Design a protein with these regions (language model features):
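Motif-centric detector for short Cys/His coordination patterns
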Residues: 1-101
Length: 101
């Protein structure tokens, strides 16, 4: 395992902040990682309340947004992994939101 992979596995999320264009995650080792919100289309389409409704999972290994049905791992953020959701899956999710709304 590379040292960067080991660091990613050891870093835990402690706090999350979502602005109109950025997802920021504070880590247990003192770092803050910030990525464009556009990396995660469900959060882009979510309301402020939905974006702010998150919980840490796995003791801080990841973050879950229940209303957006999305999870992000700290490791993924640290290696620059964007959402892997297909455009078709995102469109189905958006359609379900329109029907429910």
């Amino acid at each position: 395992m590379s040292s960067s992979a080991a660091e990613a596995r050891e870093a835990l999320a402690t706090a999350v902040s979502v602005t109109a264009d950025t997802l920021s995650v504070d880590l247990s080792d003192g770092r803050t990682v910030a990525v464009p919100l556009s990396w995660f289309p469900r959060r882009v389409h979510g309301t402020r309340a939905e974006r702010d409704d998150w919980s840490l999972v796995g003791g801080g290994l990841g973050i879950h947004w229940p209303a957006l049905d999305e999870d992000v791992s700290v490791e993924g953020l640290l290696v620059g992994r964007m959402s892997g959701e297909s455009p078709q899956s995102l469109e189905r999710w958006l359609q379900q939101r329109r029907v429910a709304g």
